Regions:
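Bacterial N-terminal signal peptides that target proteins for export
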Residues: 2-13
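Bacterial Sec-dependent N-terminal signal peptides
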Residues: 2, 19-51
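Conserved SGNH/GDSL esterase-like catalytic core that processes O-acyl groups on lipids
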Residues: 71-229
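Sec-dependent N-terminal signal peptides
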Residues: 12-20
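Catalytic nucleophile-elbow at a beta strand-turn-alpha helix junction centered on a G-D-S/GDSL motif
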Residues: 53-69
Length: 230
């Protein structure tokens, strides 16, 4: 009796395991395959009450497309605003989303040292990521500055949106990433340039660098925060 019970339990376990194995052989067990597109009845998207005809983005590194420790072509092409603009296009967004291209496949990971090093890459032969050997200098944007839609500037804090010092070399707020596409370096501000485009819709990602700098300094320098009265 006990032997038969043991045999039945073993058979049940084997049966369940076999069933689970066969189920796992499903080429799409999570149902992630998208259903076929009905080309005869395309989906129509509506913007609702929003107007996406002139979408602009304001922010820091994530907005600019800064990845792998540098700003370079592929990162800009895959920036969050660029991806968002592509989706908004289906609901009346602009056909082209202009970004201040750096025209560099490697970017610059050490702007304070002459951009001798480019983006970081993962090398399994050494511990941690290493920069590519050659970086490219941060040069002025050669395109039409008045038609830009992405005003992301890597590393900036809230206050740097409001001051012309962000485009003025030698000042504490200076950023070469803004100076390169500023409408009037040393005079214009990021926010002023944004407003001049008369956006119909915008996204804003800013403020995390204010907190991050305070945290990474050991919470010892409250002056790093943007002045709330500014």
């Amino acid at each position: 009796m006990r032997k038969n019970l043991h045999s039945n339990i073993v058979k049940s376990i084997i049966g369940i395991a076999l069933l689970a194995f066969l189920s796992s052989c499903n080429s799409d067990p999570l149902g992630t395959t998208e259903p076929p597109v009905d080309t005869n009845n395309p989906i129509e998207y509506s913007p609702g009450s929003a107007d996406f005809s002139n979408y602009v983005a304001i922010g820091n590194s994530l907005t600019a497309g800064f990845v792998d420790g540098a700003l370079y072509n592929l990162g800009q092409q895959k920036s969050i605003p660029a991806l968002l603009a592509g989706q908004l296009r289906a609901a009346g967004g602009q056909a082209v989303f202009n970004q201040p291209s750096v025209n560099s496949d490697y970017g610059c990971s050490n702007p304070g040292s002459g951009c001798t090093l480019g983006k970081y890459k993962l090398d399994a032969d050494i511990p941690g990521p290493s920069p590519t050997i050659n970086g490219d200098p941060i040069t002025a944007y050669a395109g039409d500055k008045s038609s830009l839609h992405n005003f992301g500037v890597p590393g900036i804090q809230v206050g740097q949106l409001l001051t012309p010092d962000t485009g003025t070399p030698g000042t504490a707020a200076f950023s070469p990433y803004y100076a390169r596409f500023a409408s009037s370096p040393g005079t214009s501000t990021i926010l002023g340039d944004v407003i001049s485009t008369d956006p119909s819709f915008f996204s804003l990602w800013i403020g995390n660098n204010d907190v991050l700098g305070y945290a990474t300094s050991g919470a010892t320098n409250e002056a790093i925060f943007t002045d709330p009265a500014a």
